[in-house]
Design a protein with these regions (language model features):
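ABC ATPase NBD coupling module
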Residues: 75-98, 116, 124, 131, ...
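ABC ATPase "signature
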Residues: 237-241
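Conserved ABC ATPase "signature" region
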Residues: 72, 132-150, 259-260
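A short, surface-exposed alpha-helical micro-motif characterized by mixed small hydrophobic
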Residues: 222-224
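Conserved ABC ATPase signature
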Residues: 155-159, 163
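A short, proline-enriched helix->beta-strand linker immediately N-terminal to the Walker B motif
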Residues: 174-178
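Short catalytic/signature loops enriched in Gly
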Residues: 3-4, 78, 145, 152, ...
Length: 274
């Protein structure tokens, strides 16, 4: 088993309303270096809240009620994420952990070219780079995600949904983070484009060695791409196992219910394609 990259211990998030709502309850898990960890569960189970919480991206009334998150940096330094001040946390994000947000392909600025939006990442986080260097990095990123450098002057409306999503993946990949969190990255894409995006995520993971937390309610999709899957229900992780174990030998009744809720073309379970 590879070494850990992220350790989450007894992590809890509460929405401070009347009455308070426990959105994440004492979650403990470990993400391994180079691993794709799927996070599955129905809408409202706390998946996105957990992902935002470990990156300290929560907004009021959500508050971290307990627990800790440790990032095991490739340099050998263990970083207590909850202990970082605001400035250090801003430096940490995108450099160490990046995120592809839910509905991200619609988050691009419609009146700015994709090239200028990608350059902004380097302008903010790599201020020592000159314009020529930034442009070269952007062109390379567009080639890596198979959008193509010829699209550098294109506006978002000139790209398909799949291409816009690839641009968002390029943005998350820009600073070569060790962890990429993806919140429903294939939502609103047709099945063929979904499959292309999933294949590319897997290829990029192998090429650059980053880990992925992949969040979705679509369990069959996670069975294809994930090394391990955590099943979440009502703020708790009720099962955590390899994708094969989740598919062939689920232990929790809720996991079995999730698996049985997806229709199949035949009356029997299909063969897991990985």
């Amino acid at each position: 088993m590879s070494e850990p990259l992220l350790s989450v211990r007894d992590f809890s998030v509460v929405y401070d309303v009347d009455p308070p709502v426990e959105a994440v309850k004492n979650v403990t898990l470990e993400l391994h270096r180079g691993e794709i960890l799927g996070l599955a569960g129905e809408s409202g189970c706390g998946k996105t809240t957990l992902a935002y919480g470990v990156q300290r991206l929560l907004r009021a009334p959500a508050v971290i009620a307990g627990g800790g998150v440790t990032f095991h940096d490739a340099s050998g330094v263990d970083v207590d994420i909850n202990a970082l001040d605001v400035e250090a946390m801003q430096r940490f994000r995108w450099n160490k952990i990046s995120m592809v947000f839910q509905g991200a392909m619609n988050a691009l600025n419609p009146v700015a070219t994709i090239g200028s939006q990608l350059e902004d990442v380097f302008e903010i986080h790599r201020p020592d780079m000159n314009r020529r260097q930034r442009r070269a990095e952007v062109e390379e990123l567009l080639e890596i995600v198979k959008v193509g450098r010829q699209r550098i002057a294109s506006f978002p409306h000139e790209l398909s949904g799949g291409m816009r999503q690839r641009v968002m993946i390029a943005m998350a990949l820009a600073l070569r983070p060790q962890l990429m969190v993806m919140d429903e990255p294939t939502t609103a894409l047709d099945v063929l484009v979904q499959r292309e995006i999933l294949k590319q995520i897997s290829q990029l993971r192998h090429e650059f060695g980053f880990s992925v937390i992949f969040i979705t309610h679509d369990l069959p999709l996670l069975l294809e791409i994930s090394d391990r899957i955590a099943i979440m229900r009502e703020g708790e992780i009720v099962e955590l196992a390899t994708a094969e174990q989740i598919w062939t030998d689920p232990q929790h009744e809720y996991t079995k219910t999730l698996l049985s809720s997806f229709p199949r073309l035949t009356g029997e379970r299909g063969v897991l394609t990985r």
